[in-house]
Amino acid sequence: SLIKISTEIIEDSYDETQDVFNLLDLAESKLYDITQGNIKKSTETAQSLVIQAKKKIEEISNKDGLSGVPSGFSDLDKLTSGWQPSDLIIIASRPGMGKTALTLSMARYMTVAKNIPVAFFSLEMSSIQLITRLISSETGLSSEKLRTGNLEKFEWEQLNVKVSSLENAPLYIDDTPSLSIFDLRAKARRLSSQYGIKLIVIDYLQLMTAGGSNKNGNREQEISTISRNLKALSKELNVPVIALSQLSRAVETRGGSKRPILSDLRESGAIEQDADIVTFIYRPEYYKIDEWDDEERTPSSGQAEFIVAKHRNGGLNNIRLKFVSSLGKFENIDNYDSPFEFQSKINQEGPKVNPDQAFESGSYREEGEDMPF
């Protein structure tokens, strides 16, 4: 198989009509398939697929738990049964709503509480900034205290004790700026092969480039290439891919509650089409709206709504969450000290991680920081 694949790569390399970035991506994909033992027939019989589907259904029904990767948010996990393998999930909002904070809350739960390996590609913030946010969430010390280093003796002790679980978490952060979709796919394959990654986060989609394959196209075509490749990556690695996305300014100009809708997605056509799940983060408090637009007119202070606007394989819902701005994290609105009552089917053992390699450091990038507070 290796000789056959190598011959195909060499033959394609002589074809001057081939785009070099597409060729590199195709070559790495074929070599990755060999290392993973994925060389198989391109088609399967209905009988074989039915047997596989029945086996999966039986595995889920015979155990009390989720079939996917748990987010840590109870109502969301009940709706989705966890983030499913091969799904592309879009989490979108206007700047300042807390996209990064929400996904960090999920990543913290997956890696610290459930020992599920997660890859986090941060194109906006440096890896040190992300880790500082996680330390704030884990220790209960405000981001302001951590930024200034103005800690009391007992707070230093609190920091040293509580950060140990974070040090050993199977979380892998890459903060390469202006990452191309082909570079991201190559990095994701290596992380999957080396660490058994079960979920990938990209923060955020509009900061990516399509590489050389779309150099003459417009931005909408470039976003289309990126979203299509992210969906292909989720299927290739058989893991959920969560891509954060910005919303257009149309949300700000609209009257009423300013709750986002699907058409608010930037370059929305391709993103909406490729995604299996499209969600929005909405905080009325951000717009100085002090109560929810429901019958009870309950106060909206310190609360957010996680809107599942598209769900290819399930239902839709608007899920209320608690937002702790001082710590930059989201929690279940009820009983958030015990965020999740089920057990995920995802293999939680994962590879053993060297604490010195668990986090990749990077340079600070202060501009354009998507801070929710």
Which stretches of residues belong to each language-model region?
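Pre-Walker A adenine-sensing motif
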Residues: F73-G82
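P-loop NTPase nucleotide-binding module
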Residues: G82-S126, L179-S193, K198-V201, Q221-N229, ...
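Walker B catalytic acidic pair
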Residues: Y204
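Structural recognition of the conserved hydrophobic beta-strand(s) that form the central parallel beta-sheet
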Residues: V201, P240-S245
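C-terminal regions of RecA-like/P-loop NTPase motor modules
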Residues: F182-I197, N214, R228-L237, A250-F373
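Cytosolic-facing regulatory segments adjacent to core modules
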Residues: K78, Y109-G196, A210, I319, ...
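Short, small/acidic-rich helices and loops at N termini and domain boundaries
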Residues: S1-N62, M97, I116, T139-L141, ...
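Flexible beta-alpha connector loops of hexameric P-loop NTPases
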Residues: S143-E152, Y172-S178, T209-S224, V251-S263
